[in-house]
Amino acid sequence: MIKSNYTTALAAGLVSVVSIGAALPSSAQHGPRDYQRTALTAMKEGKWQEALDAVDRCIRVYEPRIKTLGLDDGFGWFYYQKGVCLAQLKQYKEAVEAFKACYTKFPSAKNQLVKMALFREGENYCRLGDFAKGAELLEKFLKEYRSDPVARNVNAGEVQGLLAQCYFKMDPPAFEKGLENLTSCVTSRYKGRRITDAVITNGFRAMVDAAIKTGKCQETVKFVEAHPSVMNISPTRVALYAPRLV
């Protein structure tokens, strides 16, 4: 099991997509739909392994017969939920592969979760510590999400906060790109967008660490002067990290 030092605050997005069902024909009612119901019930109860088992069985049994059964790209739902379950079980490498399969094998609009799969793939690359790949996919998501009826509900400001973490945590840190995204994230909050404390706090913590590594402490001080409210975010007080800049 891989322990991740990457913090996401978009888990709430799971709630909005769990209720989206795969587009399955009536002829598949007693096949994939049964697995779907089992998986959804287990997920809502937090039984991630049980849900994963149901989704995996459906993929093994029905994916080889997608065309003959009249199934379409809506079957990507099962790969997406497989990725969700694996991520909840902290099996991030396997989650990446599941989300990648959802995005690449079922790319049409009939797969309602195709763009969300792109986001989740990037998110889980970050959890693996591959911040460059994670940032690449999150940037791609921001270019594509507005045209998608599901993904466009994601808060772009929070994605930029996560992108900031990626850039700051790269080796070496891409400090300017991190600063650009964290600034956009904080600005979105000033404009009234709901940006969670966790996103800004963890972005700022990553910024402090990157500033120390790159000698960019003065730039960080200027950021705080321009956005003083970030020093008083609860529950984690970012001010605790200010002495590290001195």
Please provide the spans of the model-predicted regions.
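N-terminal leader/linker segments that initiate helical-solenoid repeat arrays
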Residues: 24-77
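Residue register of alpha-helical TPR repeats
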Residues: 33, 70-73, 77, 116, ...
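TPR/TPR-like alpha-solenoid signature
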Residues: 36, 80, 119, 161, ...
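Residue-level detector of the short coil/turn that links helix A to helix B
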Residues: 46, 90, 129, 171-173, ...
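Flexible helix-coil transition and linker loops at the boundaries of alpha-helical arrays
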Residues: 61-73, 104-112, 144-154, 188-197, ...
